[in-house]
Amino acid sequence: MDKFQEEILAGIPQDRLPEPKPYDKTINHAPKRKDILTAEEKVLALKNALRYFPAKFHAELAPEFAKELKDYGRIYMYRFRPSYDMYARPIDEYPCRSRQAAAIMAMIQNNLDPRVAQHPHELIIYGGNGAIFQNWAQYRLTMKYLAEMTDEQTLSMYSGHPMGLFPSHKDAPRVVVTNGMVIPNYSKQDDWERFNALGVSQYGQMTAGSYMYIGPQGIVHGTTITVMNAARKQLKARGIAGTRENMKGMLFVTAGLGGMSGAQPKAGNIAGVVSVTAEINPLAARKRYDQGWVDELHENLDELIPRVRKAMENKETVSLAYVGNVVDLWERLAAENIPVDLGSDQTSLHNPWAGGYYPVGQTFEESVKMMAEEPERFREAVRASLRRHVAAINRLSAGGMYFFDYGNAFLLESSRAGADILRPDGTFRYPSYVQDIMGPLYFDYGFGPFRWVCMSERPEDLAKSDEIAVNILKKELETAPEEIQGQLNDNIHWIEEAGRNNLVVGSQARILYADCEGRTKIALAFNEAIRKGEISAPIVLGRDHHDVSGTDSPFRETSNIYDGSRFTADMAIQNVIGDGFRGATWVSIHNGGGVGWGEVINGGFGMVIDGSADSDRHITQMLFWDVNNGIARRSWARNEGAEHAIMREMERTPELTVTVANHTDENIVRKAIEEL
């Protein structure tokens, strides 16, 4: 047994404390959080933190944790960061009694890999506050439980806290994850700040808290699809064919080079456009540049603007990053009358007061200081910045730019700030990308962000899986109806180019938008390849929560639901329950994700497949439900694409019977109301 395995099995040290670890200034750290707790609540926060440790250590740890709470607004327990390097190892290197649990351990470590995580030492994976655990004691204890558990047990995870191992059975999930599940009346931003500071709840974002983040590749594909289809909309509106050749030279302007938003420059390159992405955090910008995800860094607008003009004129495929405030960028583009084709934003506006958005007129360092020391002044600065932000976008939109909200609460927070973002009827001036693109073209037809991770961590296994997937999609395309041929063609192109685009950051993983038929056939083929030894180790199947069925989010995933049910969350809850008893290895359900705490309910799953007949059964049963639950809900909302998809699925699957909506002549309804 090596030191890595010994440290995992040791869990939380019981005999001797590890030495305090120096604060590493070479990595990106979370900003200081709001000082929100009362004096008595701070006492409670310390008591809550100390309950993980034997009483003999409390006198030494209490002042240390109190200082962390004062300095950072949270108790992270930095001392307990493990001594080993953090990355996903091949499955056979983990100490375990359950191979399924070993796979989960690898997925957890991939989330925390410094190449992958946004603020790894604060256990924040992406989005400024998307946490996998609240503190390092929770990480250590969880890894110990996973190493010790059998396939007859289930680990319950309460917002990062491992509540314990409970007896179950081999077909039950090995882990059930909940994040941020609070009583609905206590789901405001300050509630999260308070509960998180107390150590009793966390914001798990989506794949951050559910052990399914695969680095920026996870969103590159969705962003590529979005940018390409937005470009097609623009070209079509101009009477031009939506070909890749015609997209060259188009200008896409946006913001954010963080964990999720860092995908935008790569997506722009794959789509073949000129992209300009603003990022105020120099460390984040440099990280994406060093990883090869953005081509050029520019700190001066006087240098950037001529470079943009030249790139557009030469129809280059290039990604430019502006290291500065996005409002300054938008205002300069408007002042110079630069013809922007596509505009969006991926600042973390789901978290506007705690590092998700930095106001114009302040340096990054000044904003961090104001955020912690003058929170109300910071809030007003953010609101004023959003008003200017929207004003510049409106000027460029009047000149023909197509702007879309990328599901980060930009429209929502801008409206709350009093920006000119609403139409006279109270609706938003700009669409969500789900309303215009992902909803009608992808989700309604059952296409969503299916993904897999090779537990061998061997690139050759990933290459083999790519080959299998593309062959299955090409076969599906042969008999596919016209409505989904475009989606299949885009995804065939994606997977064929994936290796050349160097998308892997962290684990050997791939994402691919596929429908129920595609996901199931691909997964079964993977399982057969494992069985035959063509793929050398198990594979983890999963998806982003940003999918057909997993998320109820009225300002994003379900923004194209128009029957009045977009503020309900039955679909997401039904989904996680159904996945849990149909063969998922782990399931998760979260409050928040994408648009923010209190605005969303979202869930996900992971499934370990190992070449067994049980894996075949789990694939067939669970993936079918995981997609068709959402199609059924969307078809009941009378979404045309979903109605087509569910009727096709009922023809393909005789055991499926879905309640079908009858359409009404609106004139009959209006007349009935008028005659009352």
List each language-model region with its residue ranges.
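Residue-level detector of anion-binding/catalytic polar loops
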Residues: V274, P339, Y402
